[in-house]
Amino acid sequence: MYGDRYIDWDGAHVRTLFAPVTVYTRPGCKPCERVKDKLTAAGIDFDAVDVTANSEAYDYVTKVLNAMSVPVVVTDTHKPILGYQPDQLDELIDYYTASETGL
């Protein structure tokens, strides 16, 4: 269980229904925790995927996105955010919070 909003799914994923954001992460990653904390504080639902426990996720992050480290934040609406990028995260949060309020 990650907070009270997430369902632990097979130890490698933390999933919600219809989450608009996926955060690729690994255990012990402080920047990953900051990303997840920032999204949680903003009320943004997300899936957290542990790349050390999911080889398909690892391949996607390293081979498709060409990311060398995590966190990696992926959505259907924005280009991937590689690493902890507070300004890009704020833009993403603004987009999703505005779309939820209809603005």
Curated annotation (Swiss-Prot):
PROSITE patterns per record: GLUTAREDOXIN_2
Domain Glutaredoxin: 9-103
InterPro entries: GlrX_YruB (IPR011911), Glutaredoxin (IPR002109), Grx-like_ET (IPR051548), Thioredoxin-like_sf (IPR036249)
SUPFAM superfamilies for the chain: Thioredoxin-like (SSF52833)
Paired cysteines (S-S): none
Gene Ontology molecular function terms on file: electron transfer activity
Name this polypeptide is given: Gene 56 protein
Organism: Mycobacterium phage L5 (Mycobacteriophage L5)
Gene: 56
